């Protein structure tokens, strides 16, 4: 049921889709997740990104692992933006999944392959 409510799209044309960018140095993985990279997302009490979650699903693993969650509680400061950086260690390949929640337009997802 939840699966049918999660939206996705091309982040270059849709401001709600989380953008996932990562760097790997040995086992240390640095992942930046942002919403509104190409088209800025509003950050007002009436329309904002409330949170971002990052998951890692290792190849051969049964379930994805929650790497972290960031909540954005200030929705009136023009200097804040929905962006978070996560660090974790793994030697495995797999998929990175990001979820973001817009208080008006709901859940949005994106995924990238971690090599």
Curated annotation (Swiss-Prot):
Molecular function in Gene Ontology: iron ion binding; superoxide reductase activity
Protein family according to the UniProt entry: Belongs to the desulfoferrodoxin family.
Catalytic activity: reduced [rubredoxin] + superoxide + 2 H(+) = oxidized [rubredoxin] + H2O2
Disulfide partners: none
EC category: oxidoreductase
Protein name: Superoxide reductase
Residues annotated to bind Fe cation: 14, 16, 41, 47, 102, 105
Pfam family for this entry, one: Desulfoferrodox
Lineage, highest ranks first: Archaea, Methanobacteriati, Methanobacteriota, Thermococci, Thermococcales
